[in-house]
UniProtKB/Swiss-Prot annotation:
GO terms for cellular component: glutamyl-tRNA(Gln) amidotransferase complex. HAMAP family: GatA (MF_00120). It is an enzyme of class 6 (ligase). Keywords: ATP-binding, Ligase, Nucleotide-binding, Protein biosynthesis. The gene is gatA. SUPFAM superfamilies: Amidase signature (AS) enzymes (SSF75304). It holds the Pfam family Amidase. This is Glutamyl-tRNA(Gln) amidotransferase subunit A. The lineage of its organism: Bacteria, Bacillati, Actinomycetota, Actinomycetes, Acidothermales. Heterotrimer of A, B and C subunits. It catalyses: L-glutamyl-tRNA(Gln) + L-glutamine + ATP + H2O = L-glutaminyl-tRNA(Gln) + L-glutamate + ADP + phosphate + H(+).
Amino acid sequence: MSDLIRRTAVELAAMIAAREVSAEEVTRAHLDRIAAVDPAVHAFLYVDADGALTAARAVDARLAAGERLGPLAGVPLALKDVFTTRGMPTTCGSKILEGWIPPYDATVVQKIRDAGIVILGKTNMDEFAMGSSTENSAFGPTRNPWDLSRIPGGSSGGSAAAVAAFEAPLAIGTDTGGSIRQPAAVTGIVGTKPTYGGVSRYGLVAFSSSLDQAGPFARTVLDAAYLHAAIAGHDPRDATSIDAPVPDVVAAARNGDVRGLRIGVVRELDGDGYDPGVRHQFHQAVKLLADLGADVGEVSCPHFEYALAAYYLIAPSECSSNLARFDAMRYGLRLGDDGTRTAEDVMALTRAAGFGAEVKRRIMLGTYALSSGYYEAYYGSAQKVRTLIIQDFAAAFEKFDVLISPTTPTTAFPLGERVDDPLKMYLADLDTIPVNLAGNAAMSVPIGCSPDDGLPVGLQIMAPVLADDRLYRVGAALEAAYRERTGRLLIEDVPDPAANQEGAA
C-alpha cells in the first residue's frame, strides 16, 4: 500500500505545495487504491480517472508557475452522486437517472474545482438519499471496510466507505436526517452536517428541501474543517443560503481546547434500545470531556422523542413534491414512448420501473400526508412538532454551548438485516434527526470501538445555528485525547479490504 494514501489531506496538501510530491502522483496512488479495493467495497459508481489526472496536472502546472493555491489544492476527493457534475454522470443511485450527464456543476462542485481539489469520481448512495444503509442503491450495496458483511451507513455510505477504505482522504456527502453523521459513525471517520443554509444546495438533487445539507467527510477533524471551509459560504443561486460570515472552523479545529466549555448530555438520546457497547463508549467519552476541563451536565429535550415521527411525515411530503419532476419528459429514463401511448402512460411506466421500492414508499407516504383530508392531521402536526424541537434546542443552548449524544443507537448492522423492516431501518437515525429538523450544526467523531463487536462508535456534537466552529473545537479535543491514549487514530485499525474480502461475494 502506498504511503501517500495513509496521509491526511492537510499533510498531502503541504507536500504538494512544497513540491515534495506531485498532485498527479497523489492522484495516481488513490486511483490505484480504488482499483485494488473497490471491487470489494463498491464505494464508487463512477471513477473519472482521466478527469482526475487532468485536474491534478493542472495543479502541478500552476504550482510550477509560482501560483499560490488553496490549502487543499491537489488533494483527491470522492463526491456523492447526488450533485450535478458537468462531464460526469449524476444518477442519485437511481435507474431513472442512469446515464444522465448534467450540463452544469453544482455550486459545491464548482467550489471544489476552484480550490484545486481533485475529484476522483462519484460515490454510491441510497436512491435519492432515502435510506440508512446504502442498500437502496439501484446499483448494488456498498460494504463497510471494517467488516464487508455489514452496512457502511447511509445514505452517503459510498462517500464514508471511500474515506474509511483509504480510497480518498476527503469526501462530500449530504445529510437530510443523519446521512453524513450516521455513516461517519459506523465507519470510524469524521462527518459534519453544517448549519442549514451554510453550504449551497444549488445543484444538489433535492430529497427534502428544508432538511438537505451538504457537508464533509474526512479521517481527521482538521481535514474536515478545511473541506468545510472550502465549500461553505453564501450563494445567491440558493434561496435558502445564509448570507453571513462562515465560522472559522479551521481555527477551532486547531484549537481543540474544551476547558470551560459547557457541554450538555441529552437525556432523551440514551437508554433503552441502545447497544450496551455504544453506551459504554459514549459514557467513557463524556467522562473524558469532563477530565479535559469541560463543564458537563445533563439536559432534557422532551420533544425529541417525537422527532422521528415528525421527520417521516415532513421529509416524504417534500420528497413527493420534489420527485414529481422526474417525469420522463426532459431527461433521464423514458419507457414506452413508441407513439402508441399518452404522455401520462409513458410517465407512469417510467416511474414504475425507474424508482425503487423505498422511493415509492416515501412518495406514497408524502402524498398521503399532503392530501386534503389529512394535511393538518399529519403534515401540519409534524411542523408543529418541528417548532417544539427548535424550542427545545433554544432552551438547551441557553444553558450549554454544545450538546452531545451517541451518533447512532447501534454499530453497523449486517447487510440485509433491516431491508424488509422499514421501521427498524428508520431507527438508525434516531439520534441525528432532531438536528435536521432544527437546522443546527452537528458532527460525528469516532470515540473507539464497541467492546461487544469491535466496530466503530461515534459521538455526536450539536451546536447552535452558525456556531459550527464549536463542533470542531470539541471534535478536535476528543480526537487528540484518543490519539494520546492509543498512539493513533481509530481509522488506522481498519482492516484492509483488499486482503479481507470474506463476505463480499
